[in-house]
């Protein structure tokens, strides 16, 4: 008799355990990042677009002072599409928007100001342009803000900051 009761109890535990575990997993809140008002979340980062027009260096400094961020690094096509949508949804008419990509030693070796590896590339046709000698990179409106061109770092453009959420 005790053996039968043990078997029934064990059977019930085996049958109930998977469904109880599934309920527990479904009840867990999903990990979400919290971004300050005016910024938008993508992946584990917050993105802030401003139409304030600054030089590349001043824009990067602005981003560093804002939640320890940097000018935006675009590390994939998906992220580039998100950034382009963010800019377009603002309604801006700006032709160029700064990114964090630059050539600090002026030797045509590009680096993200955030220190991220420069692996993904989305240059506009004809860029980078060796005769232009631009050492900073902007997104261009004529490509829907999806392609990059090298530009004069002293030009004053709007920009996107990226920081951890």
Curated annotation (Swiss-Prot):
Its main location: secreted. The keyword Oxidoreductase does not apply. GO terms for molecular function: carbohydrate binding; growth factor activity; identical protein binding; protein phosphatase binding. It comes from the Eukaryota. One of its GO terms (biological process) is positive regulation of dendrite extension. Keywords: Disulfide bond, Glycoprotein, Lectin, Pyrrolidone carboxylic acid, Secreted, Signal. Expressed only in regenerating islets and normal exocrine pancreas, but not in normal pancreatic islets. Expressed strongly in pancreas, moderately in gall bladder, and weakly in liver. Residues 1-21 form the signal peptide. It is found in: Secreted. Disulfide bonds join 35-46, 63-161, 136-153. Glycans are attached at residue 129. Gene3D superfamilies: Mannose-Binding Protein A, subunit A. Residues 33-163 form the C-type lectin domain. The keyword Translocase does not apply. Might act as an inhibitor of spontaneous calcium carbonate precipitation. This is Lithostathine-1.
């Amino acid at each position: 008799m005790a053996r039968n009761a043990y078997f029934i109890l064990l059977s019930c535990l085996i049958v109930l355990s998977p469904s109880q575990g599934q309920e527990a997993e479904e009840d867990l809140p999903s990990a979400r990042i919290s971004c300050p008002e005016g910024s938008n979340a993508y992946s584990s980062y917050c993105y802030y677009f401003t139409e304030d027009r600054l030089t590349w260096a001043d824009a990067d400094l602005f981003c560093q002072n804002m939640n320890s961020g940097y000018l935006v690094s675009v590390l994939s096509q998906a992220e580039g599409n998100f950034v382009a949508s963010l800019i377009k949804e603002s309604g801006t008419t700006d032709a160029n928007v700064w990114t964090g990509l630059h050539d600090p030693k002026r030797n045509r070796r590009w680096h993200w100001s955030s220190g991220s590896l420069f692996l993904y590339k989305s240059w506009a046709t004809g860029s980078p342009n060796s005769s232009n000698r631009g050492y900073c990179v902007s997104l261009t409106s004529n490509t829907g803000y999806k392609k990059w061109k090298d530009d004069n770092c002293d030009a004053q453009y709007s920009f996107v900051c990226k920081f951890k959420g």
